[in-house]
Amino acid sequence: MEKYFPKYVPFFSLLALSGLLYLLWSITSLESWNCQTVSTFYQLQNSIQSVLKTSELLLPTEFNYSFCAHLGQEPTLEEAREESYLLKSIAWPEPSTLGLPLRQSSDPAQSYYTIQDTGDLRVGGQLAVKVHMHNFLGQPKKHGGDFLVARLHTPELVAGVAGQVRDHNNGNYTIFFPLLWAGVAQVELTMIHSSEAVMVLKRLREEQSDRVFFKSLFRSGYISESTLCNPCLPLKPQPLCNYTDPQTGEPWYCYKPKMLDCDTRIDHSKGGYKKNLLTVYESQFFQSGVNIKVPIHSAGVDNVTVLPASKVRTKKMRLEFTPSGYYYQGSWRPLSGVVPRQFNTSSLINQCLRGKMLYMYGDSTVRQWYEYLITNVPEFKEFNFHSAKNVGPYMGVNMNYNALLKYRCHGPPIRFTSVSSAEMRYISNELDGLSGGSDTVVVISIWSHFSTYPVPVYIRRLRHIRKAVIRLLNREPTTLVFIRTGNLQKLDAESSLFNSDWFSQQLDTVLRAMFKGLNVQLVDAWEMTLAHHHPHQLHPQLDIVSNMVNFILSHICPVRKKKKRG
């Protein structure tokens, strides 16, 4: 009988697939899925999997079976088109030949850059730098895809600006810097990951989205159990608890406890990080000091002298890249939108925040701003909600100036130690509860905890937040809304697999595109950390945070234009 079984595999597969399609047809919407439905779905997909495993010929590659593809509300045609456009915009160049040995991968120690023109460089112009990537054999690379970042800086002036890297897909790159101050400026170039390492990161993002796992504690009386949770759970013949948000359709599932009901969940927490994610071959591309965040040096001079702008009126040069701002004398100077102000005393901050309500939503990088204001403005008194440390929610009230500060973390996934399930809120739902107005300031930061997931998961979350922001601005157009971008951080061989700057850069590109054209202010944390001399950290150092807060306060309390005398 066994020797005839393979020829019936297509029949059994078709039969199982028909049952699956019937089940999907009978489910009218995601919100109506209950625990029993989801569990049945799991068991049915498991049946399909077991049938397919009878013939290796039917499985040409190793698949990551999970529930991810079937979660979330169906996007509209317009949303699907936008998602397709966004994914194309972050498509990364791939090596023409995969599986090359380490010695043929990018070696920052043997790569170099050259400054194109050291002649008459003046403020208002630009600097072009050519980068030539070589492998460990000293041979020129023939393809692109290396992840490089660069800055131009003058230590004596505490000045710095980010550069734009252009990949020519042949092993060569061009970096453009705007020239924004006079003096001797030095080029600093870093290879964060080789193109070969990026291919590994792409695989992990698509195939191992549950490499950070979460858990929830369930309790009733003296009985307690913990189970794994995620929006993407590995297929198991085990019942699920469905915690999909009814307003947004954002999916979240936990395996059902063996002895308790789903409504006995009391918290959410980070479970941990998966180990042994890489093959021996892949691990070669993640070596600290060798090919992770290693500087690339110049083949000649590494600095230029920038002269003051010419007093003679000349045709304005077309710049290849215009950054959002730059540092000068340690202060961030935006290039558009607002005149920067320095709020160096609690008195200045108090005057600016008089009568204001600041609502901060998101991850720990925006919680930093809440903590900065609470620490530097003693008039703010915190309410004790007995919240877990570094989790929140937090609230500070300034009775003297009638001001309010609030911080709340975003909904799952979030890698905090322990969050009460009653406090798990989605940003879009919170925004819908705000009245808004000229006294309301909203600050949002959501990026770091999505680095391990396929990009469509992040797009879906931002889509809900964007809709809520639009609704808020329609209710009260005078509401100020700030969106914080992601930033660079410290990396090693292990953290690169979960928190790589490449993941953050991909999400950052998506975030900027999705909020472009809306009446929101972007706090460019990416450029503010790249242009600064401090080492990269997930939580930037105090003077960077100070510049970020000053940027926000400069928008809340802009410099008043002097009226012209008639």
Curated annotation (Swiss-Prot):
Gene: nxpe3
Stored Pfam families: Neurexophilin, NXPE4_C
GO terms classed as biological process: nervous system development
Keywords from the named record: Glycoprotein, Secreted, Signal
SUPFAM superfamilies, per the entry: E set domains (SSF81296)
Leader peptide range in chain numbering: 1-32
Primary subcellular site in the record, as a coarse category: secreted
Protein name per the record: NXPE family member 3
Family statement: Belongs to the NXPE family.
Cellular component GO terms held in the UniProt record: extracellular region
PANTHER family for the chain: NXPE FAMILY MEMBER, NXPE FAMILY MEMBER 3
Subcellular location as annotated: Secreted
Keyword Glycoprotein among UniProt keywords: yes
Glycosylation sites: N64, N172, N242, N303, N344
